[in-house]
Protein backbone atom coordinates (compact mmCIF):
# COMPACT_ATOMS: atom_id res chain seq x y z
CA UNK A 1 0.00 0.00 0.00
CA UNK A 2 2.86 2.31 0.93
CA UNK A 3 4.51 1.73 -2.45
CA UNK A 4 1.27 2.41 -4.38
CA UNK A 5 0.78 5.67 -2.46
CA UNK A 6 4.29 6.87 -3.26
CA UNK A 7 4.83 5.42 -6.75
CA UNK A 8 1.46 5.37 -8.57
CA UNK A 9 1.37 8.44 -10.90
CA UNK A 10 -2.05 9.64 -9.68
CA UNK A 11 -1.69 8.61 -6.02
CA UNK A 12 1.74 10.27 -5.90
CA UNK A 13 0.18 13.68 -6.69
CA UNK A 14 -2.48 13.16 -3.99
CA UNK A 15 0.18 11.97 -1.54
CA UNK A 16 2.46 14.97 -2.14
CA UNK A 17 -0.47 17.41 -1.87
CA UNK A 18 -2.47 16.09 1.11
CA UNK A 19 -0.56 13.36 2.99
CA UNK A 20 3.23 13.72 2.99
CA UNK A 21 3.12 17.47 2.29
CA UNK A 22 5.64 19.22 4.58
CA UNK A 23 3.66 21.89 6.48
CA UNK A 24 4.82 24.52 9.01
CA UNK A 25 4.46 23.24 12.58
CA UNK A 26 2.88 26.44 13.91
CA UNK A 27 0.04 27.37 11.53
CA UNK A 28 -3.09 28.31 13.47
CA UNK A 29 -6.79 27.72 12.85
CA UNK A 30 -6.82 30.74 10.50
CA UNK A 31 -5.14 28.40 8.00
CA UNK A 32 -8.18 26.06 8.07
CA UNK A 33 -10.20 28.19 5.68
CA UNK A 34 -8.53 26.98 2.48
CA UNK A 35 -9.79 23.45 3.05
CA UNK A 36 -13.18 24.80 4.18
CA UNK A 37 -13.46 26.69 0.89
CA UNK A 38 -12.74 23.42 -0.93
CA UNK A 39 -15.54 21.78 1.07
CA UNK A 40 -17.90 24.67 0.24
CA UNK A 41 -17.08 24.36 -3.47
CA UNK A 42 -17.77 20.60 -3.38
CA UNK A 43 -21.09 21.21 -1.59
CA UNK A 44 -22.10 23.87 -4.13
CA UNK A 45 -21.25 21.67 -7.12
CA UNK A 46 -23.13 18.63 -5.72
CA UNK A 47 -26.26 20.52 -4.58
CA UNK A 48 -26.17 22.63 -7.77
CA UNK A 49 -26.09 19.51 -9.93
CA UNK A 50 -29.21 18.12 -8.22
CA UNK A 51 -30.97 21.50 -8.52
CA UNK A 52 -30.11 21.68 -12.25
CA UNK A 53 -31.87 18.32 -12.76
CA UNK A 54 -35.20 19.93 -11.81
CA UNK A 55 -34.70 23.60 -12.75
CA UNK A 56 -35.89 25.08 -16.05
CA UNK A 57 -34.08 28.14 -17.42
CA UNK A 58 -37.12 29.82 -18.95
CA UNK A 59 -38.74 33.08 -17.83
CA UNK A 60 -42.22 31.55 -17.74
CA UNK A 61 -41.30 28.48 -15.65
CA UNK A 62 -38.09 29.34 -13.71
CA UNK A 63 -39.88 30.66 -10.60
CA UNK A 64 -42.37 27.77 -10.62
CA UNK A 65 -39.58 25.21 -11.06
CA UNK A 66 -37.83 26.49 -7.90
CA UNK A 67 -41.15 26.28 -6.02
CA UNK A 68 -41.60 22.75 -7.45
CA UNK A 69 -38.11 21.77 -6.17
CA UNK A 70 -39.03 22.97 -2.67
CA UNK A 71 -42.49 21.37 -2.59
CA UNK A 72 -42.49 18.24 -4.73
CA UNK A 73 -38.92 16.97 -5.12
CA UNK A 74 -37.72 14.57 -2.40
CA UNK A 75 -35.57 16.63 -0.02
CA UNK A 76 -35.61 19.39 -2.65
CA UNK A 77 -36.10 22.06 0.02
CA UNK A 78 -32.93 21.07 1.87
CA UNK A 79 -30.91 20.88 -1.37
CA UNK A 80 -32.12 24.33 -2.39
CA UNK A 81 -31.40 25.92 1.01
CA UNK A 82 -28.03 24.16 1.33
CA UNK A 83 -27.12 25.68 -2.03
CA UNK A 84 -28.36 29.19 -1.14
CA UNK A 85 -26.82 29.27 2.35
CA UNK A 86 -23.77 27.33 1.16
CA UNK A 87 -22.98 30.41 -0.97
CA UNK A 88 -23.10 32.57 2.17
CA UNK A 89 -20.75 30.18 3.97
CA UNK A 90 -18.49 30.19 0.90
CA UNK A 91 -18.15 33.98 1.03
CA UNK A 92 -17.76 34.03 4.81
CA UNK A 93 -14.80 31.62 4.52
CA UNK A 94 -13.50 33.57 1.51
CA UNK A 95 -13.44 36.90 3.37
CA UNK A 96 -11.73 35.33 6.41
CA UNK A 97 -9.22 33.59 4.10
CA UNK A 98 -8.34 36.92 2.41
CA UNK A 99 -8.23 38.70 5.79
CA UNK A 100 -5.78 36.09 7.08
CA UNK A 101 -3.64 36.61 3.97
CA UNK A 102 -3.55 40.36 4.64
CA UNK A 103 -2.83 40.03 8.37
CA UNK A 104 -0.03 37.48 8.13
CA UNK A 105 1.49 38.76 4.87
CA UNK A 106 0.65 35.71 2.74
CA UNK A 107 0.29 38.10 -0.23
CA UNK A 108 4.08 37.99 -0.63
CA UNK A 109 3.49 34.65 -2.39
CA UNK A 110 2.46 36.71 -5.42
CA UNK A 111 1.46 33.95 -7.87
CA UNK A 112 -0.77 32.26 -5.29
CA UNK A 113 -2.23 35.65 -4.27
CA UNK A 114 -2.97 36.71 -7.88
CA UNK A 115 -4.66 33.39 -8.71
CA UNK A 116 -6.67 33.95 -5.52
CA UNK A 117 -7.85 37.35 -6.82
CA UNK A 118 -8.91 35.76 -10.12
CA UNK A 119 -10.75 33.11 -8.06
CA UNK A 120 -12.51 35.84 -6.05
CA UNK A 121 -13.76 37.55 -9.22
CA UNK A 122 -14.91 34.22 -10.69
CA UNK A 123 -16.76 33.23 -7.50
CA UNK A 124 -18.44 36.66 -7.37
CA UNK A 125 -19.55 36.33 -11.01
CA UNK A 126 -20.91 32.83 -10.33
CA UNK A 127 -22.83 33.96 -7.23
CA UNK A 128 -24.31 36.94 -9.08
CA UNK A 129 -25.55 34.77 -11.96
CA UNK A 130 -26.91 32.18 -9.52
CA UNK A 131 -28.93 34.87 -7.74
CA UNK A 132 -30.67 35.70 -11.03
CA UNK A 133 -31.85 32.12 -11.68
CA UNK A 134 -34.88 31.86 -9.30
CA UNK A 135 -36.38 34.75 -11.33
CA UNK A 136 -37.90 36.57 -8.37
CA UNK A 137 -38.23 40.36 -8.18
CA UNK A 138 -34.77 40.89 -6.68
CA UNK A 139 -33.26 38.43 -9.19
CA UNK A 140 -34.67 40.36 -12.14
CA UNK A 141 -33.95 43.87 -10.87
CA UNK A 142 -30.53 42.90 -9.52
CA UNK A 143 -29.63 41.56 -12.97
CA UNK A 144 -30.99 44.71 -14.63
CA UNK A 145 -29.14 47.14 -12.33
CA UNK A 146 -25.78 45.34 -12.26
CA UNK A 147 -25.60 44.55 -16.01
CA UNK A 148 -26.67 48.14 -16.72
CA UNK A 149 -23.47 49.36 -15.03
CA UNK A 150 -21.57 48.26 -18.13
CA UNK A 151 -23.37 50.98 -20.09
CA UNK A 152 -21.10 53.45 -18.23
CA UNK A 153 -18.19 52.26 -20.41
CA UNK A 154 -17.64 55.03 -22.99
CA UNK A 155 -18.55 54.40 -26.65
CA UNK A 156 -19.17 50.61 -26.50
CA UNK A 157 -21.19 50.52 -23.24
CA UNK A 158 -24.74 50.33 -24.65
CA UNK A 159 -23.83 47.75 -27.30
CA UNK A 160 -22.04 45.67 -24.67
CA UNK A 161 -25.07 45.64 -22.34
CA UNK A 162 -27.45 44.62 -25.15
CA UNK A 163 -24.98 41.92 -26.22
CA UNK A 164 -24.92 40.49 -22.66
CA UNK A 165 -28.72 40.72 -22.39
CA UNK A 166 -29.26 39.09 -25.78
CA UNK A 167 -31.94 41.71 -26.48
CA UNK A 168 -33.13 45.12 -25.34
CA UNK A 169 -33.87 44.08 -21.75
CA UNK A 170 -33.20 41.30 -19.25
CA UNK A 171 -35.32 38.47 -20.68
CA UNK A 172 -35.38 34.79 -21.65
CA UNK A 173 -32.04 34.96 -23.52
CA UNK A 174 -30.36 36.52 -20.45
CA UNK A 175 -31.71 33.86 -18.09
CA UNK A 176 -30.66 31.00 -20.39
CA UNK A 177 -27.08 32.24 -20.79
CA UNK A 178 -26.77 33.04 -17.07
CA UNK A 179 -27.79 29.45 -16.30
CA UNK A 180 -25.22 28.12 -18.78
CA UNK A 181 -22.46 30.28 -17.24
CA UNK A 182 -23.57 29.48 -13.69
CA UNK A 183 -23.26 25.77 -14.50
CA UNK A 184 -19.81 25.91 -16.13
CA UNK A 185 -18.06 28.46 -13.85
CA UNK A 186 -17.77 26.23 -10.73
CA UNK A 187 -15.76 23.73 -12.78
CA UNK A 188 -13.50 26.56 -13.98
CA UNK A 189 -13.19 27.59 -10.30
CA UNK A 190 -12.20 24.00 -9.40
CA UNK A 191 -9.48 24.10 -12.10
CA UNK A 192 -8.23 27.48 -10.80
CA UNK A 193 -8.15 26.03 -7.26
CA UNK A 194 -5.72 23.37 -8.50
CA UNK A 195 -3.51 26.11 -10.01
CA UNK A 196 -3.79 28.04 -6.70
CA UNK A 197 -2.57 24.93 -4.82
CA UNK A 198 0.13 24.24 -7.42
CA UNK A 199 1.68 27.68 -6.84
CA UNK A 200 1.22 27.39 -3.06
CA UNK A 201 3.06 24.06 -2.96
CA UNK A 202 5.93 25.54 -4.99
CA UNK A 203 6.82 27.83 -2.07
CA UNK A 204 5.08 26.16 0.88
CA UNK A 205 2.64 27.83 3.28
CA UNK A 206 3.31 31.01 5.21
CA UNK A 207 2.98 30.86 9.02
CA UNK A 208 1.86 33.26 11.80
CA UNK A 209 5.43 34.44 12.45
CA UNK A 210 5.97 35.27 8.77
CA UNK A 211 9.42 33.65 8.82
CA UNK A 212 10.81 30.65 6.93
CA UNK A 213 9.59 27.37 8.36
CA UNK A 214 11.97 25.14 6.38
CA UNK A 215 13.79 24.13 9.57
CA UNK A 216 10.62 22.86 11.26
CA UNK A 217 8.10 21.04 9.06
CA UNK A 218 5.59 18.32 9.93
CA UNK A 219 3.58 16.02 7.60
CA UNK A 220 0.13 17.33 6.64
CA UNK A 221 -1.44 13.99 7.57
CA UNK A 222 -2.42 13.25 10.35
CA UNK A 223 -1.77 16.63 12.03
CA UNK A 224 -3.58 19.05 9.72
CA UNK A 225 -6.11 16.59 8.32
CA UNK A 226 -7.47 16.20 11.87
CA UNK A 227 -7.25 19.95 12.49
CA UNK A 228 -9.10 20.70 9.23
CA UNK A 229 -11.71 18.08 10.10
CA UNK A 230 -12.59 19.98 13.29
CA UNK A 231 -13.05 23.19 11.28
CA UNK A 232 -15.16 21.29 8.75
CA UNK A 233 -17.44 19.90 11.48
CA UNK A 234 -17.95 23.40 12.90
CA UNK A 235 -18.72 24.74 9.40
CA UNK A 236 -21.23 21.92 8.80
CA UNK A 237 -22.83 22.66 12.19
CA UNK A 238 -23.15 26.39 11.41
CA UNK A 239 -24.53 25.69 7.90
CA UNK A 240 -27.09 23.18 9.20
CA UNK A 241 -28.24 25.53 11.98
CA UNK A 242 -28.80 28.19 9.30
CA UNK A 243 -30.49 25.84 6.81
CA UNK A 244 -32.73 24.01 9.30
CA UNK A 245 -33.73 26.85 11.62
CA UNK A 246 -33.78 30.05 9.54
CA UNK A 247 -33.08 29.28 5.87
CA UNK A 248 -34.36 32.67 4.66
CA UNK A 249 -32.44 34.76 7.21
CA UNK A 250 -29.89 36.00 4.64
CA UNK A 251 -32.29 36.12 1.67
CA UNK A 252 -34.59 38.88 0.48
CA UNK A 253 -38.40 38.58 0.89
CA UNK A 254 -38.83 40.31 -2.51
CA UNK A 255 -37.41 37.22 -4.18
CA UNK A 256 -40.55 35.29 -3.22
CA UNK A 257 -42.47 37.51 -5.65
CA UNK A 258 -42.17 36.43 -9.31
CA UNK A 259 -40.19 38.84 -11.52
CA UNK A 260 -42.27 41.72 -12.84
CA UNK A 261 -40.61 44.20 -15.25
CA UNK A 262 -43.44 46.71 -14.62
CA UNK A 263 -42.95 46.91 -10.85
CA UNK A 264 -39.66 48.08 -9.31
CA UNK A 265 -38.97 47.00 -5.69
CA UNK A 266 -38.51 49.96 -3.29
CA UNK A 267 -34.93 48.98 -2.38
CA UNK A 268 -32.84 47.04 -4.87
CA UNK A 269 -29.98 45.35 -3.04
CA UNK A 270 -27.76 42.31 -3.66
CA UNK A 271 -26.97 39.47 -1.24
CA UNK A 272 -25.07 40.43 1.95
CA UNK A 273 -21.67 39.41 0.59
CA UNK A 274 -21.84 42.05 -2.18
CA UNK A 275 -23.17 44.88 -0.01
CA UNK A 276 -19.74 46.40 0.81
CA UNK A 277 -18.94 46.77 -2.92
CA UNK A 278 -22.50 47.99 -3.63
CA UNK A 279 -22.11 50.68 -0.93
CA UNK A 280 -18.84 51.87 -2.56
CA UNK A 281 -20.59 51.93 -5.95
CA UNK A 282 -23.48 54.03 -4.58
CA UNK A 283 -21.26 56.45 -2.66
CA UNK A 284 -20.05 58.08 -5.90
CA UNK A 285 -22.72 60.21 -7.66
CA UNK A 286 -21.16 59.66 -11.11
CA UNK A 287 -22.05 56.39 -12.90
CA UNK A 288 -18.65 55.67 -14.48
CA UNK A 289 -16.84 56.78 -11.31
CA UNK A 290 -18.99 54.43 -9.24
CA UNK A 291 -18.28 51.48 -11.55
CA UNK A 292 -14.52 52.18 -11.45
CA UNK A 293 -14.61 52.45 -7.63
CA UNK A 294 -16.55 49.16 -7.48
CA UNK A 295 -13.98 47.31 -9.63
CA UNK A 296 -11.01 48.94 -7.90
CA UNK A 297 -12.39 48.09 -4.43
CA UNK A 298 -11.59 44.43 -5.19
CA UNK A 299 -8.75 44.91 -7.69
CA UNK A 300 -6.90 46.90 -4.99
CA UNK A 301 -5.91 43.50 -3.55
CA UNK A 302 -3.58 43.04 -6.55
CA UNK A 303 -1.41 46.03 -5.58
CA UNK A 304 -1.13 45.11 -1.88
CA UNK A 305 2.23 43.29 -2.40
CA UNK A 306 3.59 46.54 -3.93
CA UNK A 307 2.27 48.62 -1.00
CA UNK A 308 3.97 46.33 1.55
CA UNK A 309 6.63 48.61 3.04
CA UNK A 310 7.18 46.77 6.35
CA UNK A 311 10.39 44.89 7.08
CA UNK A 312 8.36 42.22 8.86
CA UNK A 313 6.06 40.03 6.82
CA UNK A 314 3.39 39.36 9.46
CA UNK A 315 1.39 41.87 11.52
CA UNK A 316 1.76 39.67 14.61
CA UNK A 317 4.37 41.96 16.21
CA UNK A 318 3.21 45.25 14.66
CA UNK A 319 0.53 46.74 16.96
CA UNK A 320 0.02 49.95 14.92
CA UNK A 321 -0.63 47.97 11.73
CA UNK A 322 -2.95 45.70 13.71
CA UNK A 323 -5.02 48.73 14.73
CA UNK A 324 -5.35 49.76 11.07
CA UNK A 325 -6.21 46.20 10.01
CA UNK A 326 -9.07 45.99 12.50
CA UNK A 327 -10.18 49.52 11.54
CA UNK A 328 -10.37 48.25 7.94
CA UNK A 329 -12.41 45.24 9.11
CA UNK A 330 -14.82 47.53 10.99
CA UNK A 331 -15.01 49.82 7.94
CA UNK A 332 -16.00 46.88 5.72
CA UNK A 333 -18.72 45.90 8.22
CA UNK A 334 -20.03 49.51 8.14
CA UNK A 335 -20.01 49.42 4.30
CA UNK A 336 -21.92 46.11 4.39
CA UNK A 337 -24.55 47.68 6.67
CA UNK A 338 -24.80 50.84 4.50
CA UNK A 339 -25.22 48.77 1.31
CA UNK A 340 -28.47 47.39 2.72
CA UNK A 341 -29.86 50.80 3.72
CA UNK A 342 -31.99 53.13 1.54
CA UNK A 343 -30.28 56.03 -0.28
CA UNK A 344 -31.14 58.85 2.12
CA UNK A 345 -29.59 60.99 4.86
CA UNK A 346 -27.54 60.06 6.96
CA UNK A 347 -26.71 56.79 5.14
CA UNK A 348 -25.34 58.57 2.04
CA UNK A 349 -22.77 60.51 4.10
CA UNK A 350 -21.79 57.48 6.21
CA UNK A 351 -21.30 55.46 3.01
CA UNK A 352 -19.12 58.16 1.43
CA UNK A 353 -16.94 58.53 4.54
CA UNK A 354 -16.59 54.73 4.86
CA UNK A 355 -15.67 54.43 1.15
CA UNK A 356 -13.00 57.14 1.39
CA UNK A 357 -11.65 55.53 4.58
CA UNK A 358 -11.47 52.12 2.85
CA UNK A 359 -9.18 53.38 0.07
CA UNK A 360 -7.22 55.71 2.40
CA UNK A 361 -6.44 52.89 4.83
CA UNK A 362 -5.13 50.55 2.14
CA UNK A 363 -3.36 53.04 -0.15
CA UNK A 364 -1.94 55.58 2.31
CA UNK A 365 -2.24 54.80 6.04
CA UNK A 366 -1.11 51.16 6.10
CA UNK A 367 2.11 51.71 4.05
CA UNK A 368 2.90 54.88 6.09
CA UNK A 369 2.40 53.18 9.45
CA UNK A 370 4.59 50.27 8.28
CA UNK A 371 7.42 52.74 7.57
CA UNK A 372 6.93 54.34 11.01
CA UNK A 373 7.16 50.88 12.62
CA UNK A 374 10.39 50.19 10.70
CA UNK A 375 11.84 53.42 12.15
CA UNK A 376 10.65 52.55 15.68
CA UNK A 377 12.31 49.14 15.41
CA UNK A 378 15.47 50.82 13.99
CA UNK A 379 15.29 48.70 10.81
Curated annotation (Swiss-Prot):
Membrane topology: Multi-pass membrane protein
Pfam families linked to this entry: Cytochrom_B_C, Cytochrome_B
GO molecular function, one term: ubiquinol-cytochrome-c reductase activity
Protein's organism: Eulemur coronatus
Protein name, as recorded: Cytochrome b
Membership in a protein family: Belongs to the cytochrome b family.
Cofactor(s) of this protein: heme b
CDD domains: cytochrome_b_C (cd00290), Cytochrome_b_N (cd00284)
GO CC field: mitochondrial inner membrane; respiratory chain complex III
Biological processes per GO annotation: mitochondrial electron transport, ubiquinol to cytochrome c
Gene that encodes the chain: MT-CYB
PROSITE patterns in UniProt: CYTB_CTER, CYTB_NTER
Subcellular location: Mitochondrion inner membrane
Alphabetized UniProt keyword annotations: Electron transport, Heme, Iron, Membrane, Metal-binding, Mitochondrion, Mitochondrion inner membrane, Respiratory chain, Transmembrane, Transmembrane helix, Transport, Ubiquinone
Anything else known: Heme 1 (or BL or b562) is low-potential and absorbs at about 562 nm, and heme 2 (or BH or b566) is high-potential and absorbs at about 566 nm.
Signal peptide boundaries: none
